[in-house]
Design a protein with these regions (language model features):
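Bacterial N-terminal signal peptides
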Residues: 2-15
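Short, surface-exposed ligand- or partner-binding patches at beta-edge/loop junctions that are enriched
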Residues: 86
Length: 138
């Protein structure tokens, strides 16, 4: 993960640091529906196959070698929009958003509770939010 932090720090443009906002899966779903949020599922392909992917999240495996280029492409294609990151329980998305914030990225949110929930926050699935069961790009 340290390598990821260094790569992101070098590749992402600098900006003023702000605290990363945290939202629930339901809030993320509503923000996506209103057009104000682009949702990124940062779990692994194995996890995507097991549960499906939140609708309409873009799957980008945060452990893959092409994570940074794919994220940069997504950011470039969605200027001015907030990007929300979701994982299984909220741990990885919390870590990633902290790293991205330290690298200077703004307009990002952490979707707490993730897809499965974490005992404190109900996850995307338990909230009954829509899931794609088959991922053609995973």
């Amino acid at each position: 993960m340290r390598i990821l932090a260094v790569i992101l720090a070098l590749l992402l443009s600098a900006g003023s640091a702000i605290a990363v906002e945290k939202i629930t899966p339901r809030q993320a779903h509503e923000a996506v529906g209103e057009g104000g949020l682009v949702l990124v599922d940062i779990r692994t392909p194995e996890e995507w196959a097991e549960t499906g992917i939140p609708e309409p999240a873009t799957p980008i495996d945060m452990t893959s070698a092409d994570f940074v280029p794919k994220l940069k492409e997504l950011l470039t294609g969605n200027p001015g929009r907030t990007v929300g990151f979701i994982c299984r329980t909220g741990n990885r998305s919390n870590y990633l958003t902290e790293v991205l914030e330290k690298a200077g990225l703004t307009n990002i949110v952490d979707v707490t509770g993730g897809v499965a929930g974490n005992g404190k926050v109900t996850g995307w699935i338990a909230e009954g939010l829509p899931m794609k069961q088959h991922c053609e790009t995973c």
